[in-house]
Every structure is written in C-alpha cells, then in structure tokens.
Curated annotation (Swiss-Prot):
GO molecular function: adenylate cyclase activity; ATP binding; diadenylate cyclase activity; DNA binding
Intrachain S-S bonds: none
Positions that bind ATP: G75, L93, M106, R107, H108, R109, T110
Catalytic activity line of the entry: 2 ATP = 3',3'-c-di-AMP + 2 diphosphate
Requisite cofactors: Mg(2+)
UniProt protein name: DNA integrity scanning protein DisA
Function statement: Participates in a DNA-damage check-point that is active prior to asymmetric division when DNA is damaged. DisA forms globular foci that rapidly scan along the chromosomes during sporulation, searching for lesions. When a lesion is present, DisA pauses at the lesion site. This triggers a cellular response that culminates in a temporary block in sporulation initiation. Also has diadenylate cyclase activity, catalyzing the condensation of 2 ATP molecules into cyclic di-AMP (c-di-AMP). c-di-AMP acts as a signaling molecule that couples DNA integrity with progression of sporulation. The rise in c-di-AMP level generated by DisA while scanning the chromosome, operates as a positive signal that advances sporulation; upon encountering a lesion, the DisA focus arrests at the damaged site and halts c-di-AMP synthesis.
Keywords, in A-Z order: ATP-binding, DNA damage, DNA repair, DNA-binding, Magnesium, Nucleotide-binding, Nucleotidyltransferase, Transferase
Superkingdom assignment: Bacteria
Biological process terms in GO annotation: DNA repair
PANTHER family according to UniProt: DIADENYLATE CYCLASE, DNA INTEGRITY SCANNING PROTEIN DISA
Keyword Nucleotidyltransferase found: yes
Membership in a protein family: Belongs to the DisA family.
Length: 357
C-alpha cells in the first residue's frame, strides 16, 4: 500500500508540473502544435551528467517561447528540477542500452531508459502522433486531450452525485435507528460502504483536477460542494462506532481512503476497521456514542459534546438525561441543557420527515 501511495503522490507532483496553465505545459503544447517533436529532461544531477553528450550550456530563464525555439534542434533539452531554467539545449542522451524498454520509436525509447536510469522526469513529445508521454522511474503516463479529461471528470461528478444520494439515504436511516435503539453492525457497514465509494470517486476526480490545471476550477468547485461536511460526518460516524473510544477517527477515515484506493472492501474489512473481529456477525447490535447526532445541535461546541459523552456514554444516555442531569455536566447550564433537549427532538423529527419525503 505504501508503494502505491508513493506512486500516486509522484504522479500528482508530475501532473501539477505539466498541467494546463503552467509555463512548461504552454511550451510543450507549442512544440506539439509545431509537430517538431521534442525530448525534455527535468533535473541535472550526477546521473544525468553521466549520460549527456555535447549540447550547448545556456543556463537561461525558462519561457514557453524559448522552449519552442530550442526544441527545433534535434537534441534534448535539460531543465532544472522545477522547470524554471533551461540548462542545456541540443544535448545527446546516451542511456544504458541494456535497460528494458517497451517503446519502439527512438525518442520514446531514449526517454524511457533515461527515466529508469536516473529517476528524473522525462517528457517525450511525439512528432507525428500528437502525443505527450511522461516518464519517471518505472512510471509511464500519456497525457490525454483536455476535452477527453473534462468529459471523464463530468461523468465522475455525476457518479459521485448518485453515491452521495446513497450516503444521504443511509445516514438518514441510521439516524432513525439510533434514536429507536435498534442499530446493528449491518447498517453501520452499509453506510461505510457508501463512504468508501464516495472516497474512491473523489480520488479519481482529484487526479483529473491535477491534470486539468487551470481548466479544472469548475470541477474542483463541484467536488467541494458535493463533499461539504460529508467527510467530517463520516469521521464522527467512526468515532461513534469504533470499539474503543478514540480520538484518532480522522486517521481511521484516512486509512479507509487509502484502502479504497487499492481494493474493493468486504464487510469484514470495514468491521475490522472499526476495531472489531472480522468474523463478527453483522446482525449484532451496536450502540452509538452520540458524537455525530450531538454535533448537529446548534451552538454546542465540540468540548461540551465531549463532556456530554463522557458523562452519559451513549446517545441513548444523552436522550434520557433530564434537564437537571444535563445541567450538572461541566459547561452546560440550564439554558444550554434545554437547548440540547430541544435540539435532539428537532433532529429526530427532521429524520422522520426526511424518510417520508
């Protein structure tokens, strides 16, 4: 899993460097339109120095126009790691020929071998096929047309909307069952599965946003709006049902996101994520602590909610508490005690109304 996370992180960094709207991407697109082809290496360490033969050491500030003009020469361009300077133009690259390559064209074969030998980012711009290919280490990625990415991103947003609706239905039903004191592990796992799918699609959309650069602003806004409060509520759901009382609910949610990136999760995986044995029966009753529902009561800060749960242990305990008992909790006076009682009643009524709408 760690290796996969590192690959994803590397890919995000690469895509941000060559995303639309960046000077480097503007220069690359100019070369692509001119159909001259090009080979660009980012980074000039000892390993790169050992395979560079000839070329002109120009060490000038990067500009898209400079890249376009210098790419007309047959050799490769060597830039610094951030792409802010052009160090060498018209360089011949001589990587180890024994390194395996799946490419057929000389430019792309050289690019792949250089990337594998040096772990530097290498950009190969095809002369005839209008394709930009990125190489770094064993990573190989072909940049897609912006129109294609936008279409895929919009399709993913529509899919996310559907799973958000599944989450809304599941969390509403769970809330009703919590007030009725009839929650089983099955209902909790069902809601966590919807969280898993939402996080999976979110990760896909985020990768599109990185690749779209400045063209992805609208997609980013839609994603932010769709996920508003969902992840925070999912973290509180975990805090409610984790076997041992925990303050690491955000870390557990992050673990769920990491798992969602790599595999489809079974019911037993989600049960274990909550700290229970994987073979636990899904029909077994579980009791919420009440953090999620209590967070919906207006003007009750997290510290007061913590005091409330510490005193009454469960949501049922809070619901059954009298005004006097609530008043005894640190930070809760008579006025706030009444607001808590009224708030819980309103939340319950709202949940029942939502189910029947």
């Amino acid at each position: 899993m760690e290796e996969n996370k590192q690959r994803v992180k590397s890919m995000i960094n690469i895509l941000q460097l060559v995303a639309p709207g960046t000077p480097l991407r503007e220069g690359i697109d100019n070369v692509l339109r001119a159909q001259t082809g090009g080979l660009i290496v980012l980074g000039y360490n000892e390993q790169i120095k050992s395979i560079v033969d000839g070329g002109f050491h120009i060490n000038c500030a990067f500009s898209p126009a400079s890249l376009y003009e210098l790419a007309k020469m047959d050799g490769a361009l060597i830039l610094n790691e951030t792409g802010s300077k052009i160090l060498i133009a018209n360089a011949q690259l001589v990587p180890d020929p024994s390194i395996d390559s799946i490419e057929t064209g000389m430019r792309h074969r050289t690019a792949e071998r250089v990337a594998k030998q040096t772990a530097s980012l290498v950009v190969a711009i095809s002369q005839r096929r209008n394709v930009i290919t990125l190489y770094q280490g064993n990573l190989r990625y072909t940049l897609k047309d912006i129109g294609v990415i936008l279409t895929k991103a919009n399709q993913a947003i529509q899919t996310l909307e559907k799973y958000k609706a599944v989450w809304n239905d599941g969390i509403t039903n769970l809330g009703i069952l919590e007030f009725e004191e009839v929650v089983t592990m099955s209902e909790v796992v069902h809601v966590l599965h919807s969280v898993e799918m939402v996080l999976r699609i979110k990760n896909e959309i985020v990768s599109y946003i990185h690749e779209l650069g400045t063209e992805g602003r609208l997609i980013r806004l839609q994603l932010t709006e769709l996920l508003a409060d969902l992840e925070a509520e999912a973290a509180l759901l975990i805090k409610d049902y984790y076997q041992e009382k925990t303050q690491d609910h955000h870390q557990i949610l992050k673990k769920l996101q990491d798992l969602a990136n790599t595999q489809l999760l079974e019911d037993s995986d989600l049960v274990k994520l909550l700290g229970y044995p994987g073979q636990m029966s899904l029909e077994e009753s579980v009791t919420p602590r009440g953090y999620r529902i209590a967070s919906k009561i207006s003007r009750v800060p997290p510290l007061i909610i913590e005091n409330l749960i510490n005193r009454f242990k469960t949501l049922q305990g809070v619901c059954r508490a009298t005004i006097n008992e609530l008043d005894d909790v640190e930070g809760i006076g008579e006025v706030r005690a009444k607001k808590i009682r009224e708030g819980l009643k309103r939340i319950q009524e709202h949940l029942y109304m939502s189910r029947h709408n």
